[in-house]
Regions:
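Helix-to-loop junctions at the C-terminal end of transmembrane segments
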Residues: 62-74, 158-159
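Intracellular juxtamembrane helix-capping segments at the cytosolic ends
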Residues: 114-128
């Protein structure tokens, strides 16, 4: 008789939802940032790619310095600050009066988004309520669904309510990660890991 795969816990579902939102915002920046600059600010195609360049550059910088950031702020606060920063970055894009302010917003979004998904995968691997490989598989489904379907969802939504409004909704979703993060700490191992990663 085939073994029954355990159902995801509430904490795992929250981790997955966090990854979905984070990858959704990455997809929005990757596939729609240039279009946004062109439609909102009439930026030429030769310059529209700067939006994703700013996003990607700060994301890489954030990833490379992630271990230092986590060591300084602790895991819990890193996610809290990262989600807030990412949300504010995308809101900067939405309310930017000129296109180069939107570039700053995309850069802030990239920096804020850099460590959210890696930390969620790490937390899923440390929890003890489900086998590690099963927990990671559930979180991966959410994460890569956001990555694959995100750009299409943004496009579909933009046809209905407009691209700025879609970005605003995603920004609210990013900020909501600060709440969802509190719901992923049920396993005792997460609290223990927080002690080891937070400076005395």
């Amino acid at each position: 008789k085939a073994a029954h795969k355990p159902r995801p816990t509430f904490a795992i579902l929250c981790m997955g939802l966090i990854c979905f939102i984070a990858f959704l915002s990455e997809g929005a920046a990757m596939d729609w940032s240039g279009i946004y600059l062109n439609t909102q600010f009439k930026v030429q195609a030769s310059q529209a790619g700067l939006a994703y360049s700013c996003f990607a550059a700060l994301m890489v910088a954030g990833r490379l310095s992630g271990h230092l950031i986590i060591r300084f702020f602790g895991e819990k606060n890193t996610i809290l600050y990262s989600a807030t920063l990412a949300g504010l970055g995308l809101l900067t894009v939405v309310f930017a009066p000129v296109w180069y302010v939107a570039l700053i917003g995309y850069a802030i979004l990239g920096l804020g988004s850099a460590n959210i998904v890696p930390l969620m995968f790490s937390r899923a691997g440390r929890q003890t309520e489900l086998p590690k490989h099963i927990a990671l598989s559930y979180v991966s489904v959410f994460a890569y669904t956001g990555s694959l379907l995100g750009p299409a969802l943004v496009g579909f939504g933009s046809e209905i309510i407009g691209l700025s409004q879609v970005f605003f909704i995603i920004a609210v979703g990013l900020i909501s990660i600060t709440v969802l993060n509190q719901l992923t700490s049920a396993p005792a191992t997460a609290a223990e890991a927080e002690k080891t990663q937070t400076p005395a």
